[in-house]
């Protein structure tokens, strides 16, 4: 579901509904599957489990008007990483896919495809192959990853990494030039296309 609204206009109900459906909706079945696989493993039975979650470029890159949806989908990406660390010992992989496609949920978010070729390019069919592969035995060594999939690209969305650093600073009045120096070395945020420096908000370098 979507309940798009600018943050200043968003109601608590709109926030709760989206978080509940997407983030809690990911947690709820996963915990039962995790407990089952854990018990199977402890009983000495072979386990070759897969969890494939659905994240979004709105969550991993950010999109205006979707603080609720983006937060839920970013939470799913983090959930995927942490669950992969917990469940790997039982023989379970946990990955996520951030799909970009024309669906009933997204068809009113932008201009409709003008040609059959454009509609084909935005088809959900480009999402299915990576989901199928992640569910297969071939993907056994891949876990804790978020894959972006669309008619434009198949990519691995790389998570947070530590960027430029400084020694700890006790006096906040001295932070200005230190942060400015770190910002000059930092990568610019990616926009919805996943490329560095395409984030719409101006970023100081």
What are these regions (language model features)?
Residues 30, 72, 80:
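Active-site helix of classical SDR
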Residues 96, 116-205:
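C-terminal helical subdomain
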Residues 35, 85-89, 114:
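Alpha-helical segment proximal to the catalytic Tyr-Lys
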Residues 41, 61, 77, 82-92, ...:
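Active-site-adjacent segment of SDR/Rossmann-fold oxidoreductases
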Residues 6-7, 14-16:
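Substrate-binding pocket helix/loop in short-chain dehydrogenase/reductase
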Residues 56:
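Residue(s) in the substrate-gating loop at a strand-loop-helix junction
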Residues 59-62, 67-75:
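The catalytic Tyr-X3-Lys active-site helix of short-chain dehydrogenase/reductase
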């Amino acid at each position: 579901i979507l309940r798009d609204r600018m943050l200043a206009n968003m109601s608590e109900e709109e926030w709760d509904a989206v978080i509940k459906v997407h983030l809690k909706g990911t947690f709820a079945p996963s915990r039962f599957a995790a407990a089952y696989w854990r018990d199977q493993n402890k009983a000495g039975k072979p386990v070759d489990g897969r969890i494939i979650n659905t994240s979004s470029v709105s969550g991993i890159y950010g999109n205006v008007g979707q603080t609720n949806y983006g937060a839920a989908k970013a939470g799913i990406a983090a959930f995927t990483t942490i669950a992969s660390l917990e469940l790997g010992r039982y023989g379970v992989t946990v990955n996520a896919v951030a799909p970009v496609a024309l669906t009933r949920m997204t068809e009113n978010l932008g201009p409709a495809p003008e040609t059959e070729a454009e509609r084909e390019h935005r088809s959900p069919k480009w999402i299915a192959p990576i989901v199928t592969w992640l569910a297969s035995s071939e993907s056994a060594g891949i876990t804790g990853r978020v894959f972006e999939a669309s008619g434009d690209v198949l990519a691995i969305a790389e998570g947070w990494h530590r960027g430029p650093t400084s020694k700890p600073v006790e006096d906040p009045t001295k932070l200005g030039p230190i942060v400015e120096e770190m910002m000059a070395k930092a990568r610019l945020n990616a926009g919805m296309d996943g490329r560095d420096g395409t984030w719409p908000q101006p970023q100081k370098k």
